[in-house]
Each structure stands twice: as structure tokens, then as C-alpha cells.
Swiss-Prot record:
A biological process from GO: aromatic amino acid family biosynthetic process
Subunit structure: Homodimer.
InterPro entries: Aminoacid_DH-like_N_sf (IPR046346), NAD(P)-bd_dom_sf (IPR036291), SDH_C (IPR041121), Shikimate_DH (IPR011342), Shikimate_DH-bd_N (IPR013708), Shikimate_DH_fam (IPR022893), Shikm_DH/Glu-tRNA_Rdtase (IPR006151)
Presence of keyword Oxidoreductase: yes
Enzyme Commission (EC) number: 1.1.1.25
Name of the molecule in the record: Shikimate dehydrogenase (NADP(+))
Length: 273
């Protein structure tokens, strides 16, 4: 039985074991997947022990994604640009490959909702690790532009500079945003504390799609704000969670599981249905 895991701190609430166990059942893959809570200062020891004892691959969540980036022997292009790793795989020659599947998870979720990205104007709110992880996969969908805004403008500017070689990316001060966008993505965790970004609702219009990377029971505060401002549709990040897991599973096993049934199960659990 091949061994996989997710590392984090804390890790008790992780949905990854549930998701990957269902993926394994669906694809008839002989594997086990467990959650491992590494000490805050003990990730490297924990992950080294895991691979030394037959581990095939693992997911990495907060606060260890940057450490996993340093730990990997080899990095995919999307991991290099993300500056963080959420997926590690032990190759046949013993090399540990680091990848980042977060952005692909977001894009796949948007596409399954039939949200058009090509030639669209995208607003990305936030310039932290979550934003950095999704920029390259979003740019590969050929939007007309991606505008990055952040509470600290300099962080948005630095991010736009890194990714401008890959497509039309610009940084704008939050106070200078005066028009609407086709797709608005909130990459901040503000919704978890019931807060909204300090930006004008002019970003929304009747045809806009809102996407909040956070999720919970019912609408997030960001998506409720978007709906109150007449967006066409609003989605949360639960599908991104399942999408990045499906991409990790594909990296490990070479075949892609279906996300739809698992997403339905998770949504039911979340809503207490």
C-alpha cells in the first residue's frame, strides 16, 4: 500500500485525507493517505522521516509551504514562480520533486463553472502566497489583463514585476481602482474574520463573476458583498481545494480523478445537510 500524507500545523481540520481516500476509491488505486501534524519548528525532520520510511508523496499546507520549497531537490516551473510548494513527490531515482497545484486548482474550478477567462479583465485582490501561486496558471488562460491590488501597494507592484514577463499584469493602488472587472478573485483570508478589502464596489458589475478563495457554511462575506452589488455569480474556494487535490493526485498517480462527486459530498458536510 503506497503511503501519502498532508503536513501542516494545525492539521486536525484538514479535508485532504477525506478527499484523497475518495479519489483512491474512485480510481481503484492502492494507497493510504493520512494527516501529519508536524511541530512548527520540526517540519524538515518530519517530512524526511516520512520519505525515509517509504512515503511516496505528500501535500503541504500552512505554515510549511516555503520550507517545502527549500526541501525539494527539484522544482516545477509553476512551483519556482509560486515561491512555495504544496505537493512533494518522490521520483524513482529518489529525487524529491516540488510542485504547486493551487493555481491549477483555481483555474479548473473556474472552468468547470464555465467562467470564461480568455480575453477577460481579471482583478486579483491580495499579493501574498495565495495570489503568487495562482498568477501563472491564470495567465496561461490568456486573459486580456490581470490587475493586482493589495493593502500594501509595494507588494502588488513586486508581484506584477515578477509575472509581467508571462502576460499583461499590472499593479494598481486600491484607492485608484475606478472601473469594473469581468472576474474578481479575492485571494486574501479577510472573509475568515468577517472583513472586506478596502476597495470600492465599483469593481463589480452585472456581468461580473466573483470568486473568494475562502469558504465556509453559506456565503462568504466577500461573496455576499459582491452579490449585494449585482454580480452575475459568486463562487467560494471549496472547489479550488478539491481541484488542487485532484492535480496533486494526478502528479502522484498519473491519472486524473473526477472532482464533482467529492465536491458535492464536501458541500453537503459543510452545510450540515
Amino acid at each position: 500500500m503506497d503511503k501519502y500524507a498532508v503536513f501542516g500545523h494545525p492539521i486536525k481540520q484538514s479535508k485532504s485525507p477525506f478527499i484523497h481516500t475518495l479519489f483512491a476509491r474512485q480510481t481503484i488505486q492502492p494507497l493510504e493517505y493520512v494527516a501529519i501534524e508536524a511541530p512548527v519548528d520540526g517540519f524538515l525532520n518530519s517530512v524526511t522521516h516520512f520519505f525515509s520510511n517509504g512515503g511516496k508523496g505528500c501535500n503541504i499546507t500552512v505554515p510549511f509551504k516555503e520550507e517545502a520549497f527549500q526541501f525539494a531537490d527539484q522544482l516545477t516551473d509553476r512551483a519556482k514562480l509560486a515561491g512555495a510548494v504544496n505537493t512533494l513527490k518522490k521520483l524513482d531515482d529518489g529525487i524529491i520533486l516540488g510542485d504547486n497545484t493551487d493555481g491549477e486548482g483555481l483555474v479548473q474550478d473556474l472552468l468547470q463553472y464555465q467562467v470564461p477567462l480568455q480575453d477577460k479583465r481579471i482583478l486579483l485582490i491580495g499579493a501574498g502566497g495565495a495570489a503568487r501561486g495562482v498568477l501563472l496558471p491564470l495567465l496561461k488562460q490568456n486573459p486580456s489583463s490581470i490587475t493586482v491590488v493589495n493593502r500594501t501597494y509595494e507588494k502588488a507592484e513586486a508581484l506584477a514585476e515578477i509575472f509581467s514577463a508571462y502576460g499583461a499584469v499590472e499593479a494598481v493602488r486600491m484607492s485608484d481602482v475606478t472601473r469594473s472587472f469581468d472576474v474578481i478573485i479575492n485571494s486574501t483570508s479577510a472573509s475568515l474574520s468577517g472583513e472586506l478589502p478596502n476597495i470600492s464596489p465599483v469593481i463589480f458589475s452585472k456581468g461580473s463573476i466573483s470568486y473568494d478563495m475562502m469558504y465556509g457554511k453559506g456565503k462568504t462575506v466577500f461573496n455576499q458583498w459582491a452579490l449585494d452589488n449585482d454580480v452575475y455569480q459568486a463562487y467560494d474556494g471549496l472547489g479550488m481545494l478539491v481541484g488542487q487535490a485532484a492535480e496533486s493526485f494526478t502528479v502522484w498517480r498519473g491519472l486524473r480523478p473526477s472532482s464533482k462527486q467529492i465536491l458535492r459530498e464536501l458541500r453537503k458536510n459543510l452545510e450540515g445537510m
